[in-house]
Structures are given as structure tokens and as C-alpha cells.
Design a protein with these regions (language model features):
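N-terminal secretory signal peptides that target proteins for export/translocation
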Residues: 1-7
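A conserved helix-loop-strand patch within extracytoplasmic ligand-binding domains
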Residues: 101-175
Length: 223
């Protein structure tokens, strides 16, 4: 029999969330789960889901098929709140998971204390990817705000990765001598005026940079 929906088990960690979810379901011949995740995790979860399906089959004898939905983290959170029947949610920001708890009432408000490391199963740093030979001489955040430099980053209104990019740029600006929130905001303004395209997610931004050839540098996840 298929799994029944267990929406309160939404979590930021697929590995733990799936194990939690299946505890509440009767074993049967088939099962289908939907993992709603953020943009750049498609290949990771495609491989991980196959591993989990093999593990679950060996443990219970039950076949499980895991469907995937990917997009900007903020956009995905709103889609789930609006009714997308997710079994598992893996998003880029605690802020987006909080929205599921506060606006969607889909999990407890204290979800972040439920698992180790504040329920964050993995981390990444932010890196710059430049054109071959780095013709614009981009070395640090300050270079991104220089005239004539095109920067590719997703839209922070829809992408969790873009919000991390924004926060990393803000943190750099606040570490500069004599920095104030006003000078940091001015720096961010100059940086974003150098962004020719604000895609909705990290994958679309990578396509813009790598396939469409737009931009001198892309701000992206290391992993």
C-alpha cells in the first residue's frame, strides 16, 4: 500500500527526514515520496534517493520511488505552503523552513532543535567562478562592485543560495575599515547594479553564466 502523507515530518535533512517518515508508515508493496528541494541539489538527491531506495528495500522488502521537485528555496517553500503535497522538504535556509512552521503550520516551531547541528546536515562556502584567465582580475568582493564587471547571482527574493551570497557580501562590507550599515548597503547597491540577470535559482544562474556566456563572474556554492 502507498505511504499516507505525513506532513509534520518535514525536515531540512533528507537522510534523517526519510527515516523519520517511514517509521510512521505501514510496510507494503510500493511507496512514493516527494522531496521538494532547492535548485542545485538535483544531482545529489538523484544519487542519494537511489541509495536510500536500495537501503529501504533491503531493510523492509518495500519498494520506494522518490520524486523530486527543484527550484529556488524561497519559491519552493511558498509552493509547499500553498499546497504542494511534499513528504520531505530540503531547503537552503532556516528562514524558509521557518516559513513552513509559522505560515504553513506544517511542523513544530522548534524544528531546528530536533536534530544535531541545528538540523543542518551539510554546509558549503560561497565561491567566485570566473572566465578562463580571469580577464577582469577578480580576487575579492570589492572587485564585484567595480564598473564594467558583470556579476551573475540569483534573485535573493526567490533563491536561498542568493540570500547566502547577499549575506556573504554584506559580511565582507561590514569588515572593511570604517564600515557602517550605510556603507555596506551602498556597496551592495553597486554590486547588484552590476548584475545583468537575476534568475530565480542557482541552476538557472549557472546556465546563464556557463551556457549563455553572460557575466564575468558567478557567485555560487562551492559544492
Amino acid at each position: 500500500m502507498p505511504f499516507s502523507r505525513f506532513r509534520p515530518a518535514l525536515s531540512a535533512a533528507l537522510a534523517v527526514a526519510l527515516l523519520t517518515l517511514v517509521t510512521f508508515r505501514a510496510h507494503g508493496a510500493e511507496a512514493t515520496l516527494l522531496n521538494v528541494s532547492y535548485d542545485p541539489t538535483r544531482e545529489f538527491y538523484d544519487a542519494y534517493n537511489r541509495e536510500f531506495a536500495q537501503y529501504w528495500k533491503g531493510k523492509t522488502g518495500q519498494d520506494v520511488a522518490i520524486r523530486q521537485s527543484h527550484g529556488g528555496s524561497g519559491k519552493q517553500a511558498r509552493t509547499v505552503i500553498d499546497g504542494l503535497p511534499a513528504d520531505v522538504v530540503t531547503l537552503a535556509l532556516a528562514y524558509d523552513i521557518d516559513a513552513l512552521a509559522k505560515k504553513g503550520k506544517l511542523l513544530p516551531a522548534n524544528w531546528q532543535g530536533r536534530l544535531p547541528h541545528n538540523s543542518s546536515p551539510y554546509t558549503s562556502t560561497i565561491v567566485f567562478l570566473v572566465r578562463k584567465g580571469n580577464p577582469k582580475g577578480i580576487r575579492d568582493w570589492g572587485d564585484l562592485a567595480k564598473p564594467g564587471v558583470q556579476v551573475i547571482t540569483p534573485n535573493p527574493k526567490t533563491s536561498g543560495g542568493a540570500r547566502w551570497n547577499y549575506l556573504a557580501a554584506w559580511a565582507w562590507a561590514m569588515e572593511q575599515p570604517g564600515a557602517t550599515p550605510a556603507t555596506a548597503a551602498e556597496f551592495l547597491g553597486r554590486l547588484y547594479r552590476n548584475v545583468p540577470v537575476l534568475d530565480t535559482g542557482a541552476r538557472a544562474s549557472l546556465t546563464t553564466f556557463a551556457q549563455r556566456g553572460i557575466g564575468d563572474v558567478i557567485i555560487t556554492w562551492e559544492n
